[in-house]
Amino acid sequence: MSTLRPFYFMVVFWGAAYRRYFTELLLPSLLSPNNLPGLRRERGNRFLIVTTREDWRAIQEDGMFRLLGTYAEPVWLEMRPPDPGDPKMLVMSRGHRRMAARAFEDRAYGVFLSPEMVFSDGSVATMGRLADAGKKVVLGVAIRFRYETMVPEMERRGHLQPGQPLGIGSRDLMRIALQNLHSETLRYEFDAPWFAEYPVSIYWRVPRGDGIIIHSFSWASLVIDYGALAHHDTSTFENWTVDGNYIFRNFPNPSDIYVVTDSDELALVTFTRESELHFDLVPYLAGRAPWIATWYKLNQIRALKDSEVMDPLKRRIFPTPVYLHASEVSPVWDTTRLRVARLIKRACEAPGRIDKLVALLLALTAPDLGTRLLGAFGGRFAFVLWAWRYRRFVWQRLKERGGLAAGRSRLDDGRDWASPALGPMNPIWSLRSLLREKVLQTPSSVRQRAALPTSGSDQLLDREATGAGGPSERDESVIHSERSR
């Protein structure tokens, strides 16, 4: 295998905002001394850019873009300006498909980029070294960082200066980045009370706060050896994105995949503005018993891992830990590492009878978590949980059918069918309430509880439960959007 085959760096963007990201973030980081300038020019490296005619013309006089031509040939692939209603992700996928086809045709090494990326100095040199060592695919973990606070901090520290290459070491980059996680990423912290419903990444902080251990289903494709492919499958780009099942369709063998497991080797940051994408950190697990919170979180990880969204390759890679850190990985990490390994092992095991019994117990004793558990178990067990969760609704319908109760009016559709209330239909919850609130001694507390407003999550469940005669299932597209962000 020739070591002089070219690298094709590939990016899609349009519009003034992303054009600035390209010229002020991505290009300066790639032009640091040990990135693009460190690749041998004899390779004939190219930089494929899918963008509009307006954006292509606008970058011609930019200093960083002119410097790019010294190390890689810019190649423009014109795209028409997207219509306002065009799905952004699919527009990007069309561009990725064109560039991937060009890289396959030329037997090049492909590097998929986004304009809001920043790489540590030496990252591209690492890509070249791994490609020359015969690695067919190199993947790096991809999570979001907060643009509004991290970019000003890089400027304040002197790393990011207008019109200059951005030469920042991996530990300096991680030192800033780990203090500026985006709200989406904050929801992936395992020990947080606002743990994500669809955790595409899961991380744990280590002592002293200068590092995290992360396991992920979301990866950036940093090197793809198109010369190793006899056939190129681009069907993923028809209705999905490059971080879907594109790698699995072309490189299904896990032995072909190299995962960057240490930020010292290669570090990248992807910025997102909170003003463009924001998640409220709702501490719905606060106050839960630790064993309940842990079991629930492991259940959510397992459910996502085993869902149709995940391909076999992502499931195989998921147990691989990745270390992002700003100082040495020292023995103080050991306790966290051992704990993480135990938890990931449990998450990767198939749910047994005990898990199902715990799910049933939580559905009985923690009604607000009941609906979240429905999607994790299939078949009859899911139906049992569903029936118990909405037993008040089912009981009311049965009474209506039997002539024991009047039909619901439109006002009745606002009832809280999901939240429990004192009564024989909710025996366990009622008993717990009696003991906790001492209702027998203070009858007024019953009236006080009845007057309490329902929570926002329960109101949402009400709308789902009553909008079409009963509760509706969560649309699977939510999982797709959680994965693709």
Where are these regions (language model features)?
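Hydrophobic targeting segments
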Residues: 6-11, 30, 46-49
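Short, well-formed alpha-helical segments that are part of the catalytic scaffolds
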Residues: 17-37
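Short beta-strand/loop segment that forms part of the nucleotide-sugar
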Residues: 41-54
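Active-site-proximal specificity loops/subdomain of glycosyltransferases
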Residues: 52-107
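Short beta-strand-to-loop acidic/aromatic patch adjacent to the donor-nucleotide binding site
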Residues: 106-118
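Conserved catalytic core of nucleotide-sugar-dependent glycosyltransferases
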Residues: 120-266
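Long C-terminal appendages of very large multidomain proteins
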Residues: 219-373
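Membrane-proximal basic amphipathic "stem/tether" segments
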Residues: 340-470, 475-485
